[in-house]
Every structure is written in C-alpha cells, then in structure tokens.
Amino acid sequence: MTAAMEQLVAHTILQGFDAMYGRFLDVTAGAQERFEQQDWSSVHLALKKRISFYDHHVGLVTSQIQIMLGERYANRSFLMAVKSSYENLLLDYPRYEIAESFFNSVYCRIFEHRNINRDKLFVHSSQENRIPTYPTQLTRIYHAHSGLTSLFDRVLDDTPFTQVWEDKQRDTKLIINHLKQELGAAFNDETSLELIREPFYRNKAAYLIGKITLNHDGQYQTIPLVLPVLNNSNKQLYVDACICHVNDASIIFGFARSYFMVYAPAPGALVRFLSNLIPNKTNAELYTAIGCQKHGKTELYREFLTHLDNSDDQFVTAPGIKGMVMSVFTLPSYDFVFKIIKDKFAPQKDISHATVKEKYKLVKEHDRVGRMADTQEYRHFTFERHRFSDELLAELLAVAPSIIKVTSDQIIISHLYMERRMIPFNIYVEQANDDDLRDAVDEYGKAIKQLAAANIFPGDMLFKNFGVTRHKRVVFYDYDEISYMTEMNFRKIPEPRTPEDEMSAEPWYSVGIYDVFPEEFRTFLLINPKVKALFNELHSDLFEAKYWQSLQQNITHGQYEDVYPYRGVHRLRKT
C-alpha cells in the first residue's frame, strides 16, 4: 500500500463525516421554521431523521473503503497508517473531536467492533489540549450601563426570530422582576450578560441560553440564564420562564430529555461554554444534549476509563429486583449502570432479542418528555477481569453466556447499554418519609401521564421499572413492553353476566392482544396502604379507561401536551 492510498482513505472518511454533519446542520437549521410555524409533527420527524444520519454515513464510508481496498481492507497496520494521515487532516479542522468519533465508528464497522485498543482508535483525542474555537462569534455580550430594561430589550430584539413579540415590554419587566427576586441586590446596573447567539430548540420551545455576571460591591459571580420562548395561538412570541440556578439549568439538559436542535458548526466550542455554565454536566452529557450523541458515547467511554483509573471497587449487581429480560450491574462508586440482554427471558415475556433492541431504539428517537432515560449502546465492551467478583461473573455467565467472553485478564461483552444510575422507585418508596412519599407518588403518576400524552404506553408499570433521579424526578427505564398509545385498546371491564362470572378466576369476556383494562392497575400498584391513599387522591384517573381514551383522541388529532423541563415557580405568568 502506498502513502497516497492511505491519504485517499483518510480523505474518504473525512469527506463522509463532512457529508453527514452537513446534513445534520441542514436539519438543525430548519428548527426555527418548524418552531415559528408550530409544525410540531415535523419536529419529531426531524429529530428521528437527524439521528439516522450518523449510522447511514458510517455505512456508506465503510462500503466505499471496502470497495477501494478489496481484500486488503482487513490489514490493520494499513488502517493505523490511515489513522495517522487522518490525524494530520484534523490539525486545523473545527469539528476534530466528532470527526475522531466518526473514524472510530468506521473502523469498528469494518472490523465488527473487534480488536479495539488505544493504538488503532481515538480512544483518547489526538488533540486533548486543543481549545476549540468557533468560526463566527459564538455569543453576544450585553452590559446594563443604560439600565436593565435596555439590556433585556436588546436581548429580545437580537433574537433571530421572524415573528413579533406578543408583548416585549411586559416580558422584559417580568424577567427583571423575577431576577431581582431571585438574586437580590447583586442584580443591578453593573450586571452583564453573555448570550449564545443561536437558540436551542426542543419540542414546542426555543431556549435562549447564556450566563449572567453579577457585580456586588466588587464581588463577581457568574450564574446561568435560560429564557424559554414559546409561540402563542396567534404565532406571537413570549418568554414563558426565567431560570437562573445551576441545578434548574442542569435539569433542562437532563438525560431523560430529547436532544436539542441548536445550530453548531463547531460543537466543541459550544460545549466548552456550556460546561462553564453548568459545571455539574460532563462533556458526554452536553455533547449528547445538543444532538451529537455518538460523540457523547465516545466521551462517556473516556469518562468511564478515567473513573476506572481513579477507583478500585468491584462491579456488583445493581440494586433492585432482578429483571426478566435484562441483567444489570454497576460499580458502587459510578453514576451509570450496564444493562445486558439475557439469552433466555422469563416465560411470561413473549418477545425476541431483536424486539428489545428495537424498543431501545424507539426510545432514543422519541420525545422522552423527561420521563425516559437515554442510553448509549456499545459492542464488544472490554472490562478488566479483576474488577469482577467470581459471584457476579458466574451470575452474568448464567444468564447471558452467548455474549460474554472471559480471558485471563479481560471480560468482553459483545452488546450492552449504559444508562444513568437511579434509585429504583420501589426501594425509594420503602425508604421515603411521608413528605417524600407524597412527592414520589405524584411524580410517578405524572411520569405515566406525560409518557402517555407523548404517545408512549409503558406496558409494565410496576414500581421496579422506574427510578428516582438526584433531582427526585421519576423516570421510566424498562422498555421491553412499551408501545405507542395509539396501538392500544383501553377498555372498561364488562359487568359480570352471572354470579358465576363474578366468582370466576378466569375473565368472562374476550381479551385481545392490545387490550388494556386500567381498572386492573390497582391490583399491582396499590399494595402499600399509604401509596394507595395518595394515589387515589392524586392520580385516580389513571384507573379509568375513559382517561386513556381521551389521551388517544388528543394524539390522533395531533394535540400533544406541553411538557417543559422547568417548574411552575420559574414561569413568569403564574397560572
């Protein structure tokens, strides 16, 4: 092989990445029009379409390389030389970090995810110390020298929206009053604001995101600022809320939310700004939140390696009731769990491995409304053998021997998911005090209702299939039985025809495969007397077929419930 061929292959991979990211940006650029035209059905289609580009272009490039090289493509030493040529192409390249992940994906596709190590892939970036830059001005800076009203007038005037504001003067006043209430005397005419030029679009909202620098008697403090903008029935804009605390901003970038549409020709610079804004979010979380989820996967793996290097605990079975379809393990010191699909499922689970994988794919592409955990899917994931106890390894080999390979120093799992670790809801309920229990039951009911309004029926609603986040939000994480709401047939149980019907252990009525009887939910949800009382008070409508039928009608008519990632206390107009 000649150096010219190595360079040609490197150029082919980078051109494939450019084609992919160009399409990614094209779909992202359409977010403003979809928002302004209130084309909500297209919002969901665009998200799904954008997610598909990455794997599609990896496949195209892989095929090109295989055709170019014939049988020679399996020469690993040649591809290491290609990697060296590729590194040279990235020296001044604005999206170098994501381009490295794309190279990894092509390499793994060619070699079917085998023989992955630090030499052959960009396990770590080739430019770890490079500070990413933006091709244009990333932010605008505003000062309050002419007063806070003038500052926020300019902020709203500078947005790229083509629509008029419903009442800009009112919104400016509400923003200022809210910030004064939250920040006190530190929010004054010495305040400055740095705002990202591009809005962040998700579902029915556009988010203006930046940071406020406060100057109180010479003491400087920087805090986040998030202004969600909504679109009224007359297609006029208004600022719905004002968020200025790190934890609240963090929730907006949460792992149970759909990916943002934000136009970012150099995402590394955007992530760098956001990481200063929300320091409790990792690079993996931020790249994923802005739609670069495949690079988020790379960053998550890098963060995992760093955690391994700085810990010595052993993997254990994750807390909670063991699943019928999946086995879950974790490190006690780590914030994620590893989920593997068992070789054989419990008899009552009449599904295939392919179906389980399709359900996880559905969740990634769907609007998760803050109630379904995102996952990252890995193949041929390698662990150090000494970090596993003999007991855990034996358990995993007992349930999934076909996907686990054990050597003297490694455990290689051919397919797994990584997911944010949460407290299983059934455990949380057992340990909660009365106030936390009430909040938890309310959160659980809201989770089911918001999922249903987004056209997701959880299927198995047992408490063990939900988790509680560090922000005490309830999130669903068991996807093997989810379906679209529109596929289900919600029915009221017919009245018994005879006394014998009433006493019968078997139903006296026909039951179709998609039939659901909400009255039966009480049987398995309301075992705990305290939970039963709270559920009947807060969410008794979940046991009525007509409630579910009304949600189905809304979905059929294109009416989707508004679910926003901030609490009512942050809204500028209280309702």
UniProtKB/Swiss-Prot annotation:
Catalytic activity from the UniProt record: L-seryl-[isocitrate dehydrogenase] + ATP = O-phospho-L-seryl-[isocitrate dehydrogenase] + ADP + H(+)
InterPro entries: AceK_kinase, AceK_regulatory, Isocitrate_DH_AceK
One Pfam family matching this protein: AceK_kinase
One GO term of the biological process aspect: glyoxylate cycle
Record's keyword annotation contains Cytoplasm: yes
The enzyme's E.C. designation: 2.7.11.5, 3.1.3.-
GO molecular function, one term: AMP binding
Residues that, per the record, bind ATP: 318-324, 339
Regions annotated as coiled coil: none
UniProt key word Nucleotide-binding: yes
Family affiliation: Belongs to the AceK family.
Function noted in UniProt: Bifunctional enzyme which can phosphorylate or dephosphorylate isocitrate dehydrogenase (IDH) on a specific serine residue. This is a regulatory mechanism which enables bacteria to bypass the Krebs cycle via the glyoxylate shunt in response to the source of carbon. When bacteria are grown on glucose, IDH is fully active and unphosphorylated, but when grown on acetate or ethanol, the activity of IDH declines drastically concomitant with its phosphorylation.
Protein name per UniProt: Isocitrate dehydrogenase kinase/phosphatase
